[in-house]
A protein has these predicted regions:
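Short amphipathic beta-strand starts and helix->beta connectors
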Residues: 98-100, 143-147
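A short glycine-rich beta-alpha junction/loop motif
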Residues: 105-113, 145-172
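Sequence-specific dsDNA recognition surfaces
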Residues: 24-36, 47-81
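Short, solvent-exposed alpha-helical surface patches in well-structured domains
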Residues: 25, 126, 139, 160, ...
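Short coil/turn segments at secondary-structure boundaries
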Residues: 16-19, 36-44, 142-144
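A short beta-sheet element
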Residues: 72-74, 78-132
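Non-catalytic DNA-recognition/assembly elements of restriction-modification systems
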Residues: 1-36, 168-176
């Protein structure tokens, strides 16, 4: 995170060397599931919330038949960023880059938001590090809705969140040292 700040400055500051953009212009938030040419018996990766660490890594995943998990779960693909949207997982830093998914496809907890990098605009490593920054999570926590222990960060909040977007070349340099 300190390397991130050193390279890009505070991405949440109103004083930016990078152009301010809505996060929804930097990535696709909760992309639609495409028509998939998989059979119900084909395997995909299943990633429940406990399989995502508070350190930004996937710690466990299992293969499941697509037919058993194609409904009722959050869909994602390799290089998508998973962001825990519910208390206390969001505040604790749960999030990771989906990678090494069986058939390139994963499904998991409905309590994930999916941030899909846009080719030529954003890197999964930049998105993950941004969303794991304490200041990002503190602001997100202040904008949660719901009651008691069931508060969530909305997709609308993420979509409209303003951030300084560095050039993709800078993001790739960061990715190389990540």
């Amino acid at each position: 995170k300190s390397q991130f700040i050193e390279m890009f400055g505070n991405p949440l500051s109103s004083k930016q060397k990078n152009e301010l953009k809505r996060l929804g212009q930097c990535c696709i938030i909760n992309p639609r599931r495409p028509n998939i040419a998989l059979c119900d018996t084909d395997k995909v990766s299943f990633i429940p919330m406990p399989a995502v660490s508070e350190d930004g890594y996937l710690v466990d995943m299992a293969d499941e038949e697509y037919g058993k998990v194609k409904k009722g779960f959050t869909y994602f693909e390799n290089n998508d960023v998973l962001f825990a949207k519910i208390t206390p997982c969001m505040e604790n830093g749960k999030g990771a880059i989906a990678y090494g998914l069986t058939n390139g496809i994963g499904v998991g907890s409905t309590e994930f938001h999916v941030l899909r990098p846009i080719n030529g605009i954003s890197s999964p490593y930049w998105l993950l590090t941004l969303t794991r920054m304490p200041i990002f999570r503190e602001r997100a926590a202040k904008n949660m809705s719901g009651t008691g222990g069931q508060k969530r960060v909305s997709a609308s909040y993420l979509n409209h969140f303003m951030v300084g977007l560095p050039a993709i070349e800078e993001q790739r340099r960061f990715e190389a040292i990540y």
